Amino acid sequence: MEFAEMIRTGQAQAELLRGPEEPPLRGTLCITGHHLLLSPGPQATPDLWLLLLRNVDSIEKRVAGDSGTITLRCKDLRVLQLDIEGVEATLDIARSIEALSSLESVITSFPFFYRPKGLRLGDAWHFHPPECYYKRVARETNAWRLSEANEDFSLCPSYPRAVIVPRAVDDSAVARSARFRQGGRFPVLSYYHAPSGTVLLRAGQPLTGPQKRRCSEDEELLRAVLAGARPGARGFIVDTRSPQAAKQARMTGGGTEAKAAYPGWKRLHRPLERGRPLQESFVRLVEACGDLEQSMDRWLNRLESCRWLSHVKETLSTACLAAQSMEQEGACILVHGAEGTDSTLLITSLAQLILDPLSRTMAGFQELIEREWVQAGHPFQLRCAHSAFSHARPKHEAPTFLLFLDCVWQLGRQFPLSLEFGEGMLLALFDHAYASPFGTFLCNNEKERCLCEVRTRTHSLWSGLSQPKEQRKLRNPLYVPNPLAIWPSAEPQSLRLWQGLFLRGTRPPEPSEVAWEKVWQIVTDQEKTEGSQPTDSASEPGP
């Protein structure tokens, strides 16, 4: 069906209410195939208001007399109200938005039509390939190699074409290990920690099943991991499921690594919620944050009952366990749950932020997102199909990536000088994960992105964020490089609600933006002052 067939009315007169303390905009409302536009007129500021229709999570419409109201609850947690002249126009616009905001076809989405000035197709897609990370690993150790056994995605559709595996294991053994792991997700290198000579790996669960099957090649691969580490190294398998859940998985074909089959490896269960419970926690938190008339006791009870901060605590605690085992005990770590595409990636990416100073730079953080989330197979299209307002029954939705961003925000709050990027970067990543003009978060894995030709037909988010006008909003002006590991506290007293995100629909953004700009101005003035001062040698008198 063509876009024009879904647009029931071309335009209407409307008034837009955008949020607290923001003046309403009145003008002509128009609908295109991908956007809702409001043009207030030549004298108004802004001169054009624009909303990507993919950002709409739910629509509510009311009619009274000869006018109507449409409330749009957006995936980025904003709530917008449109007061429209004419009942028929109101209903037609609501139906058009409903149809256009729920298109499922990837290739008809806006990134395939977005052509901004100053950007070229293909730019920035090559910034963070696995080969670049492998080169850094190869400078530190020769125990690993770059394998292209997955060149045609036949081993694992959710892995990239090239992955890093132990040098002592050939591609035929890798292929047999892939058949033994859920989704073909055989153990691959996620991070090499040079100070201790240990590694962080990720995988899917082993398919042992009720018969307790084994795979000699999979066992060989994990033996090679320990052999390639420092002498006497041991390993921990961090299973993000409870022991009971792991046993239940074995009855349906999954399972865990048998102790006898993997000597040198010890299994640790650190259960993390995923799927529907996590989505419901997110929904309850957003509902509580949107209620402006509740008492203090009611608010605190709802904040506790939604358990969102408990998920943050458990995630940070598990990431700290993995990082501490590598840094202080010299152990290798393998992380997996069931599929290995959700809580597994949470832990591997957070552990790297804790340990690796490079991951805390702007470029390093972008590489981390690309390598540990996009290329590692997090199913963004399924997980971010709806946000917290949708009335549709959740199927595959889960705010796993949001939970990661919240944990990173907690890191930034506890270590305000150690991250080169600021809250603006985290908010931008949240927004683009759910609705974006760029192609980075499209599809569910690399195979799908190749089939849709995402890299040749859409722009990379990283090219958009690298523009000078964006950098000031994304960078942390207080950043000071920190070569050490940063150890966050996961105690309840140390965790805070991420107000910049969860309260963005109920508090005006301007005070925060003004404060952020003021900090930048102070830092800029200080740098100018220091730059204009004479050096010690120049100020010393001559002989």
Curated annotation (Swiss-Prot):
Q: Where is the Myotubularin phosphatase domain?
A: 124-502
Q: Which GO terms describe its cellular component?
A: cytoplasm
Q: Name one GO molecular function term.
A: protein phosphatase binding
Matching PROSITE patterns, A to Z?
PPASE_MYOTUBULARIN
| GO process terms (BP) | negative regulation of autophagy; phosphatidylinositol dephosphorylation
**Domain of life, per lineage:** Eukaryota
Coiled coil region boundaries: none
Record-linked InterPro entries: Myotubularin, Myotubularin-like_Pase_dom, PH-like_dom_sf, Prot-tyrosine_phosphatase-like
Q: Which Pfam families match?
A: Myotub-related (PF06602), PH-GRAM_MTMR6-like (PF21098)
Name the family: Belongs to the protein-tyrosine phosphatase family. Non-receptor class myotubularin subfamily.
Q: Which PANTHER family does the protein's record reference?
A: MYOTUBULARIN PHOSPHATASE DOMAIN-CONTAINING PROTEIN, MYOTUBULARIN-RELATED
Function summary: Probable pseudophosphatase.
Q: What is this protein called?
A: Myotubularin-related protein 9-like
* Organism from which the protein derives: Bos taurus (Bovine)
Q: Which gene encodes it?
A: MTMR9L
